[in-house]
Structures are given as structure tokens and as C-alpha cells.
Amino acid sequence: MTHQYLIEIGLEDMPAHVVTPSLQQFHDKTVAFLKENHLDHGAIDQYATPRRLALLIHDLADKQADVEEDVKGPAKKIAQDADGNWTKAAIGFSRGQGMTPDDIVFKTIKGVDYVYLHKAIKGKTAAAILPGMLDVIKSLTFPTRMKWGAYDFEYIRPIHWLVSLLDDAIVPMKLLDVDAGRTTQGHRFLGRPVTLGNAADYVAALKAQFVIVEPAARKQLISDQIHQIAADHQWQIDLDADLLEEVNNLVEWPTAFAGNFDEKYLKIPEAVLITSMKDNQRYFYARDASGKMVNAFIGVRNGNADHLANVIAGNEKVLTARLEDAAFFYAEDQKRSIADDVDRLKAVSFHDKISSMYDKMARTRVIADLLADRFGLSATDKADLDRAASIYKFDLVTSMVGEFPELQGIMGEHYAQLAGEKPAVAQAIAEHYEPISADGALPESLVGTVLAIADKFDSLMSFFAVDLIPSGSNDPYALRRQAYGIVRMIAKHDWPFAVAELQTTIADALKAAGKTNNLDFAAHQQDLNAFMIDRAKQVLQGQKIRHDIVDAVTVRADADLAGILDAAKILSAHADDTDFKPVMEALGRVLRITKKQQVKVDVDTAKFENPSEGQLYDATVATAKKFDDEPTEADYQALKALADPINAYFDATMVMADDQAIRQNRLAALLQLAALIKQFGDVSQVIVK
């Protein structure tokens, strides 16, 4: 016989972003609880609204399976005295297992007799186990928690009711002053309390009280309603998945509606309209058949269609107030020039330990100019980059960005276009924030990419200079994300970026330009270098590069980021080659024997004592002439060709000869070869089978 078990947590309204992950956590911890308690079960239905998290477990076993087991105790010589009487050890062992010494049997293991008890453990019933679900409820974690009443207990929101039904029977449990029962709550305004006769009644009973508990069904209903309204008005709707998920977790009985706003507000930049509707009001914006935005929106209320006209009017009033403010800010911002706003950045702090935003922009301009030369930008791109770097933060002091912080960069691009800046300059202003997340879109333009790198690297150097370095999970200034973004941009364009050398060069350039702001850029250069290489590791791991190859290519503290990425890709591309193992073994042998060796002599070919020495040295010299500054496929093939000469060399040559002059000469020759191999890192760490 199997059962259905319903467990529901009834709460005050949860934040929308918490609902879905909390339901998944509730499910996963329940599955773990059932597994730990050896209760078999079938499918588990997951239900959630802003006011509840619930699970319905199907085909739940009536009880645990009965188990028989033999429990090993002490050796016989310890369990019985010389007269065969049971000792305290035997009596205590049997009592601990709920049995008596009369139940003891002996088994011989490797010539030694041991005490054993054969136990038949009767499985507990589901009804006896399920009260333990209270611990699952209490174990749920949330990004924010609160207390209520006089209790010290913390949860995402106060718990008002619990339902715990095994078929038609209540499974008792109590949390604070809330006893689990069979009564759940309908819609806050449209429904009534519902007394469930059976766990299986849950979905239908709540639907009758204006609550759709299935998230997928509720989301589909919202989608269908929106599409119907759009079809009725011949609109195109961007049914944004994140917004749909958020709205779905804000309602229990959704009813979509269309609203309008004055056409005059369409003169406001589209990004502002979208932000006002989508981010601030959770509306879906509308476009006509040609893709042009129209003065309308679709919202979703938590209720039925009663008095919908009043709901629409209220929503229109709220949106109009927002758009009126936006229109005012937009007009006011255009009364000032970009130069005016740039000057106002002198009063805006980037960080109180570092500088103003104006000074940060000046440092970034120096860094961007230096990077432009290294990356080979054209004269036109350099000019556009310099202009963009001199103004790119100006929109931070605009009223529009003050009201809508998420539009920084976007409004900068728009205002730059209005002011007659070149398209490349305006685009770079918007793109310098990218990527805005670990896997976010990268800047499309070269100018925007270099500005983004320069801005982020200035932030990294500046924060490290004042010892504000991320530790553990603490990263309040998102420096890991910025460094990760730099590595991704470098990887996309395969630009040289030797972090250790670059820090010194930038510090010197800033000093020469008088733009250091008294920051000690030398204080944590090695820390920043290691920090950037760690981000390169993350990028490679995200590309599914083998961990041993990642470790091998990132071993050099002075390595160029692009070189690290290229080396990893090349080694990974050849990892399944039949000759990869002998090549890595040969190259790794050179690195191992030269490790920690420091030789300050020139190679003297006259001291070579066998043909293999000359052959390997000549091949090394010839290879070095063709080697690129950073690893290439041709470089790998050249090193691969040296595998046989290396093996022949070690077969015929004792590197650590007793004669110091011979030893030093051989090490000097091998160190030249090792320097070439190290372009690919420490390949001796590559695991080959």
C-alpha cells in the first residue's frame, strides 16, 4: 500500500525572486530526508505562490523495509571469562543493541572468535517518520531572514499555517505557535480558508478559492492572456522570460490587462520607457507591427477581472507619474554640455581612499592610450578612444541616471549622440561597462573593448594599491567579475596582456602624466598578477580545459594572459594525439632537470662530447629563431619535432657530469631549450597515460 503526502508552508508574501529557488530547495531537502529515512516514493509535485511552498509526494511507501543485520561485538575472549560467564563487555554490548547475552552467537574471522547479534529491525511507518519533515522546513535557507513576534526563530517571512496530510490523516508537527493541520488559505481577497479532506484534493480545492498553485500552469495562463491582448490590439510583445518568472511569483490568480500612457512620452529614450515599465512596474511593453514602441503596456494583477477598469486607471496613473519625472529629467539634462558634466565629476567620489571619478577617468585615459598602441589600433580608433576616455563617465551626474542608475552608460551613449559625438565614441561609452556579468555580452567595437579593459584595469590597480583586495567570498567592488571580463576580452581579440610588466609600465606612465593620485601601485603588484592568472584559470575551466593543462600553463607568474589562453587551447587540441604522451614526457624531462638551475655561462660547442649534444643544440637554436613571442601551433609543432633529439640526447648524455665545466655547459644548452618549452608553461605537470 502506498500513500500521498502533502506538506505546505503558508507564509506572508515572499519576494518574487525567492520563490522558485526556495521551492527547489524544499524539494531537494525533502528527497534527501526520504532517502535518509529509507522511505521509497514516486513523483513529487512542486507547488508555489507568493504565500506558500508545497510538495505532494506520490506513491509514498507505507513503511520502511524490514532489515536484518548481524552486529559485530568484542572478541569471545573478552566477552566471556575463563568459566564461560558473560563479562560486562558482553552484557553492555547486547544491552546497547536492545537484546540480551542469550541472543549472542559466535563467528570466526581469521582464526579469532567474535561475538555477534542477529537483529531483525522492523521498519518504521511513514506516519512515524514524517513528523521529521519539520526539520526540513526549519533547515531551508534564504538570502534574507526576519524574526517575528517574541521568537528568535528566523525565516524568509512569518509562517502563518502548516498543512501536513498523509492521505486523509494529519501528520502532527508544530513550529512556534503554528500546529500543522488540514486547513490551507485561499486567495487573500477572493478566497476563503479551505479544509482539505485528503492530500489529493489540494490543487482542485485551492483553484476553487482563486489560487493556482502550479507555477507552470499559472505562467502559461499569464502568457496566454498576454498573447490574446496583444493579438486583439495587433501588438508585438517581448515576453521577457525573467519578467514573466517574476510576475508569476507575484500572483496567485493572474488577470492580464492593457493600459495606455500619453503619446508625448514616446519622445523619451526607449531605454527609459522600458526601464520604467519593465523594471519599475513589472509591465510588458508593446510595439506595433513595424517594431515601433507604442504608448501602451500590459500588466498582470493578482485577482480576477472585477473592477478591472479601476485597476487599469491606477496603474496608468502610477506609470504617468514616473514618465513625467523622466521627461523632466531628460529636458534638464540637455540644458548642460558634456563638458559641464565632466567638470562636475570632480565632486563625485570613485572611492574615498582612491580618488574622484574625474581622476579615475584621467587615469583610464592614460591606460587606454598605452593599450591602444599595444593592441595595434588605427589612428582613427585611437582618436575615438581618447575622446571616449576623456568623457565616458559624464552621465553619472545626469538627473536621468540619478533616477535610473541601471541606465548608466546607456544614457551616456544617448546624450553623446545628441551632443554630436562620433558614433564610435558614443558606442564606447555604453560598452565600457561590459561584460556586466560573468557570461555577459562583450563589447562589439574595438574602441569600446579597449575602453572597457582600461577602465576595469584601472579599478583593479587602484583597489589593490589601497589594499582593498577580495578575500574569500567578500568582493564588494566586483573586482573578480571585472578581472574575469578583462580575460574574456583579451581572449576574444588575442591581444598581448602581460600583467606583471603592464602594471609597471602603467604606473610609470601615470607617474609621468602626474595622474597617480598618490596611489602606491607597487604595493600589491604580485597579488594582482596572481589574481588575474586565477581569473584566466576560471576562463579555461569554463571552456572545459583539463585541470592539469590549466595548472601547467598558468604556472608562470610573468606570463602573458593571451599566451596562457593560447597555450592551453593548443595543448588541449593535441591531448588526444597518439604522440602527445612521448612529446610531453620528453619536454617535461628537460624542464625537470633544469628546474632551479642557474647557469651564467655561454654554450661552448667545443665542449660537446657526443653527436647528440650538437644535434639537440643546433635544433634548439634553429627553433628559437622561428619561435613567436607567444605560443602558436607552429611553435608546438617545432617543439614536437625536438622530442626524438631530446630522447637521443638523454640516452647518450650524462647532464650532471663530474666535470663542472661540462655540467655547466650542458645545463646552459638545456636552459635555452627550457625557455622555449616554458612558452607553454610547465608541461611536466601535464598528466599523460
UniProtKB/Swiss-Prot annotation:
It is found in: Cytoplasm. Pfam families: tRNA_synt_2f. The gene is glyS. Its EC number is 6.1.1.14. The keyword ATP-binding applies. This is Glycine--tRNA ligase beta subunit. GO terms for biological process: glycyl-tRNA aminoacylation. It comes from the Bacteria. Its main location: cytoplasm.
